């Protein structure tokens, strides 16, 4: 009986966690082209890296690393269709180690290679599949 938290506390705590995660999402968006380590993100959030991962997954619905990879692929896909940058330059810009690792992830998410995606007219519609739903 005494170990249960009042519902109002639980709700406020969840709202607080959601606001922290929202701030982290904004920070990540501004840093997608930079190296992002779990330690850096945890330090920015004020959480330990283990707690951050647990809260992030609870609120966003996917692991932090997966979220970052998806966001990078989304932004890279937009650049493939809106710029003339070479695939390797886009891959490196979004912190992929090589064009091959970028192409492998890209194809895993969108079912098509970056080069073919650039030539296709599917555009941003496919990117909606990658957008996470924040709770």
UniProtKB/Swiss-Prot annotation:
The keyword Transcription applies. One of its GO terms (molecular function) is sequence-specific DNA binding. The keyword Zinc does not apply. Pfam families: HTH_18. Residues 39-60, 87-110 bind DNA. Residues 22-120 form the HTH araC/xylS-type domain. It comes from the Bacteria. Keywords: Activator, DNA-binding, Transcription, Transcription regulation. Transcriptional activator of 2'-N-acetyltransferase. This is HTH-type transcriptional activator AarP.
